[in-house]
């Protein structure tokens, strides 16, 4: 539903933007920029499907769904419970706590999930896309509990649950033009929000923006960081001894995973035993926070505590195991031995630290939209360009304001001359979902601003 903002509402949106996260306001007339964020020219990989491009309004709905604990069977767990913005959208705990215990793998970071040629998701790549991935945790017995097994309700039960919540009827109408909630609509909105999470303001990006290539020395890097970059990029055994070959699997400048990668030799399982199925890695961006501290342990089992531990693992792969990536083996069928010196290890760690950004941890468009009591306080409806219709002249002039609502649901119609103080009038959508209000608008009066809004039922 391609709604455009009316000028009358634009200024109001600017007024409340800074308070959105604190006050629980979702303003569909003044949307955060999800769809047209700046992307460096050197970033070229993109797994966004043609039938689900990121839109500001779709990602806004996705943000609400991502943070809403009502998507779990007992209202205690949301997507954000395991993917926390302040920790690069991963979990500080090794195993995340769901509605029925703890997860079998560590929570994967959600940084730059869009910017990869690998479309599959989860550590074991069992989801075919971000869309497919987005509702699988909801349908997991341990994570969010709508599995339809072991006495759990089904996803259909969740859809029934959400469909009975008026604020979701309002939001889905604002985004899709009707209050109907389906798994596909949820998947599309969640995927748009997740794909919008991007981080391109790191020290690496500052250097790459003025360099002719990744291989060139970056002017803002230290000698150690540039040395680490070269080790990362160059394959083993090349000129001058070569490098480490990290980029063979983790490809610069996106630092996404090569879709043809096997497992990396870390085959432990949080539940005990061995797990050879983990072939997917998140982007290597934002491995650590701005201070260089890990968000938590690395790998699917969080078994490596520091970046140096990670480097040591690849320096000496423990054994050739089932599914080990061939690039981590040496003939004849032996595990990789890089024989790195300590200064070389330190330079690799220094380089990996340069991949951490800044804004992704604090930007409010990726933050919790609910207020302090985990509720939304106001939803401002989108208005089409023909929503205002004037009739009459002079003191007899009137304006009719229309919008699309949920049939028979109560809204408020608001007017303001300063976008600070609003006068509200009750307005109920018709059986057909039409919202219509006609008010006096004398030409001699100051400019007036109009909007429809919905106050969620507690």
Specify the residue positions occupied by each region the protein language model found:
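Periplasmic c-type cytochrome electron-transfer domains
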Residues: 2, 21-383, 433-439, 458
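General secretory precursor processing signal
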Residues: 12-13, 82, 249, 451
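Short, composition-biased motifs enriched in small/polar/acidic residues
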Residues: 379-458
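Bacterial N-terminal signal peptides
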Residues: 8-18
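Bacterial N-terminal signal peptides that target proteins for export
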Residues: 1-9
